[in-house]
């Protein structure tokens, strides 16, 4: 059995006890976000019990990431040696891929301790049936999942969408009704000055709400008088009107919406920008905000939706896998949260996908929330600095940790190993262990360690040289990705081929 709180505490304890201070925020002035992947393993003869949560299981953090930053287009490199996206969710996922590469090396060396067992095709492997993976993030993913209706009852703040107080709730992994919302925890954009005061203001019904300035990555905006709604923008008008109706349990109304700082994709539908609950259109693809220069990194909500169809292993490892490596659950820490928004962002947008290759499927991943707050979240730092006027800023560093024997820890800043000088950029010493070129080199070592007759067909059919070559040769993965883009994620921004031709 496991609960959302148990998974959250396991990740927080790993962060506290297994990682050094390097890369962590200075709690007097900095905050960060955390994400992790947890392996849940049941007894070998009790396959499936880890999902049902009915028996004792072994839980282990196998990958962890922190970070809030993202580089702009002008800092991207064609050599694959910079981290474009250092949001915690992406760092954790790339750290997980490093772990999977190590586990595949163990499998191809026929070591029983690997999480993989032989598949039915030559050179192919599959995950042991008694193992699942759970993704944890300390804050709601940026983008569509962070567009959350704010509901209130008279003179009460911080209520969840279904009318229950936050305090004291605990969620079992098998629960499907997990709609919690923390107080006013919002992720800021890089320009955010945390000295902005959060004000309590009275509304027409005599209740109170909070308001903050508009440069946050996740913000609250509040309902304006009815009218002046653009029904042609997207379906948000109908959805928000429905959300604004009073519920039977507590007569909750949508009085505002948490905003996301992620920007809509150029050429796609755009937000109305109407003050109040109509500000955002929901269900859109979004790119992460950058400081000045626009980024090419899709929001974490969009990336989770992609991983929920294609798996977390990426194109390279798919050469060796019979089936993708999927997440069984996504758990969010204590923060503003909506089950409806998470369901929409991660699952619903891609549920209708058809004509996927064998083994690929839109997963009904469990979406849960914990009541436990991350100690270095922006809200936690603010609560601990109530008497201080000091400005809070996002921590500039990102931490990657993988359950691998050699160099598990990796700390970066601005896309390179922390401490790298301008002169040192481009050297092997400047690279993160989870940048594209480093993961590619680990993959190449795996390929060369296997005799040709034991390689999968996709790696024996033709000469492959560049990162691009190997990715494109993963035919079933590319077919699935093409179907996903054409049917659901139409506006997805892909990196130009010139950024993928390194060796």
Swiss-Prot record:
Zn(2+) binds at residues 87, 142, 300. 1D-myo-inositol hexakisphosphate binds at residues 94, 303, 306, 436, 471. Signal peptide: none annotated. GO terms for molecular function: metal ion binding; RNA binding; tRNA-specific adenosine deaminase activity; tRNA-specific adenosine-37 deaminase activity. Its EC number is 3.5.4.34. Binds 1 myo-inositol hexakisphosphate (IP6) per subunit. It catalyses: adenosine(37) in tRNA(Ala) + H2O + H(+) = inosine(37) in tRNA(Ala) + NH4(+). Belongs to the ADAT1 family. This is tRNA-specific adenosine deaminase 1. The gene is ADAT1.
């Amino acid at each position: 059995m496991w609960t959302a709180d148990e998974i959250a505490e396991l990740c927080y304890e790993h962060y506290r006890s297994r990682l050094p201070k390097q890369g962590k925020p200075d709690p007097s002035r900095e905050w960060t976000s955390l994400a992790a992947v947890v392996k849940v393993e049941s007894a070998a003869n009790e396959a499936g019990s880890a999902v049902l949560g009915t028996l004792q299981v072994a839980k282990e953090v196998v990958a962890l990431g922190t970070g809030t930053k993202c580089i702009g287009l002008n800092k991207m490199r064609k050599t694959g040696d910079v981290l474009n996206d250092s949001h915690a969710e992406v760092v954790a996922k790339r750290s997980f891929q490093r772990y999977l590469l190590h586990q595949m090396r163990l499998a191809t060396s026929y070591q029983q301790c690997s999480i993989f067992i032989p598949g039915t095709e030559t050179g192919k492997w599959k995950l042991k049936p008694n193992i699942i993976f759970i993704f944890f993030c300390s804050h709601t993913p940026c983008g569509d999942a962070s567009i959350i209706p704010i509901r209130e009852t008279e003179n009460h703040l911080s209520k969840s969408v279904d009318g229950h107080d936050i305090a004291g709730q605990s969620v079992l992994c098998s629960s499907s009704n997990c709609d919690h919302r923390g107080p006013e925890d919002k992720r800021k954009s890089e320009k955010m000055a945390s000295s902005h005061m959060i004000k309590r203001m009275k509304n027409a019904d005599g209740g109170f709400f909070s308001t903050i300035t508009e440069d946050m990555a996740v913000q609250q905006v509040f309902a304006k008088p009815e009218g002046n709604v653009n029904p042609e923008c997207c379906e948000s008008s109908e959805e928000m009107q429905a959300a604004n109706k009073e519920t039977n349990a507590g007569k909750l109304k949508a009085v505002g919406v948490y905003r996301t700082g992620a920007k809509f994709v150029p050429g796609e539908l755009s937000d109305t920008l109407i003050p109040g609950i109509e500000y955002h259109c929901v269900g859109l693809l979004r790119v992460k905000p950058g400081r000045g220069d626009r980024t090419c990194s899709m929001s974490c909500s969009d990336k989770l939706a992609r991983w929920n169809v294609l798996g977390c292993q990426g194109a390279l490892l798919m050469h060796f896998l019979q089936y993708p490596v999927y997440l069984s659950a996504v758990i969010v820490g204590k923060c503003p949260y909506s089950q409806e928004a998470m369901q929409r962002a991660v699952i619903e947008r891609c549920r209708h996908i058809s004509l996927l290759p064998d083994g690929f499927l839109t997963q009904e991943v469990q979406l849960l929330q914990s009541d436990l707050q991350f100690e270095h979240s922006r809200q936690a730092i603010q609560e601990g600095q109530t008497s201080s006027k000091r400005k809070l800023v996002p921590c500039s560093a990102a931490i990657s940790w993988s359950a691998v024997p050699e160099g598990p820890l990796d700390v970066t800043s601005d896309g390179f190993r922390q401490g790298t000088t301008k002169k040192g950029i481009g050297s092997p010493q400047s690279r993160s262990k989870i940048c594209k070129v480093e993961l590619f080199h680990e993959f190449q070592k795996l390929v060369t360690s296997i005799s040709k007759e034991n390689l999968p067909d996709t790696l024996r059919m033709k000469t492959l040289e560049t990162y691009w070559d190997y990715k494109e040769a993963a035919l079933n993965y590319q077919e699935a990705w093409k179907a996903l883009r054409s049917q659901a994620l139409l506006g997805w921004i892909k990196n130009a081929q010139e950024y993928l031709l390194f060796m």
